[in-house]
Amino acid sequence: MATHRLVMVRHGESSWNQENRFCGWFDAELSEKGAEEAKRGATAIKDAKIEFDICYTSVLKRAIRTLWTILDVTDQMWVPVVRTWRLNERHYGGLTGLNKAETAAKHGEEQVKIWRRSFDTPPPPMDEKHNYYASISKDRRYAGLKPEELPTCESLKDTIARALPFWNEEIAPKIKAGKRVLIAAHGNSLRGIVKHLEGMSDQAIMELNLPTGIPIVYELNQELKPTKPMRFLGDEETVRKAMEAVAAQGKAK
């Protein structure tokens, strides 16, 4: 029997998603399409009459703005928000800013596939000569991090390893205490939570790609285990496309 509800949403499409560039910790803005996705997701939450007691997001504006949109549309802008770097997207290191074609030309298609599809192989690190090194590594929002906490690149395994402690120490106790939680974050940090909730294998989580801007609802028991599969919120067509996209993730392209 479900005793708790958790809502998660991957941010709407960013300007760099639109350009097919590795974004990671670069603070890209939502694209026009992404802003519309956030509004559509917010409307779905409003229509479902879902209320929140506390919200969590990353320190990147594409996730924060998606959260703002949801709280605005649902008239819950007063609800407390916790921002943390631990919910940031995976750090794509030296690939940051490159599009797929440029990356394949520079490193070879086979190597790029390993970086994208492998659970525990990180991309090359972002060195001090990288165009975005200073704007990311020296940004004051990360001033409080210990040197060993500030990544220069991450695999999906690394991303999950820094997101899960925050889930275990901060979010899970709030849910168990009866708080209604919303998490607005990124594809890879949310994957880590989904993997943990559902006990998915490393391979299975690599094949799951959460759709942008569509709220995901979990009904959880007292041990925070799902009592039914994840559910998407939205109109029938939006939900159908989202489910098809997720179902197709593991198939050969």
UniProtKB/Swiss-Prot annotation:
Catalytic reactions on record: (2R)-2-phosphoglycerate = (2R)-3-phosphoglycerate; (2R)-3-phospho-glyceroyl phosphate = (2R)-2,3-bisphosphoglycerate + H(+)
Keywords attached to this entry: Glycolysis, Hydrolase, Isomerase, Phosphoprotein
Protein origin, superkingdom: Eukaryota
PROSITE patterns: PG_MUTASE (PS00175)
The protein's enzyme class: isomerase
Positions annotated as active site in the UniProt record: 11 (tele-phosphohistidine intermediate), 89 (proton donor/acceptor)
Residues annotated as binding substrate: 10-17, 23-24, 62, 89-92, 100, 116-117, 187-188
Keyword Isomerase among UniProt keywords: yes
In-chain residues carrying the UniProt-annotated modification Phosphotyrosine: 132-133
EC number: 5.4.2.11, 5.4.2.4
GO biological process: canonical glycolysis; gluconeogenesis; glycolytic process; Notch signaling pathway; response to mercury ion; spermatogenesis; striated muscle contraction
InterPro entries xref list: His_Pase_superF_clade-1 (IPR013078), His_PPase_superfam (IPR029033), PG/BPGM_mutase_AS (IPR001345), Phosphogly_mut1 (IPR005952)
Example of a GO cellular component annotation carried by this entry: cytosol
Residues bearing PTM Phosphoserine: 14-15, 118, 135
UniProt cross-references to SMART domains, sorted A to Z: PGAM
HAMAP family: PGAM_GpmA (MF_01039)
NCBIfam families: pgm_1, PRK14115.1
Subunit and interaction comment: Homodimer. Interacts with ENO1.
Descriptive protein name: Phosphoglycerate mutase 2
Biological source species: Rattus norvegicus (Rat)
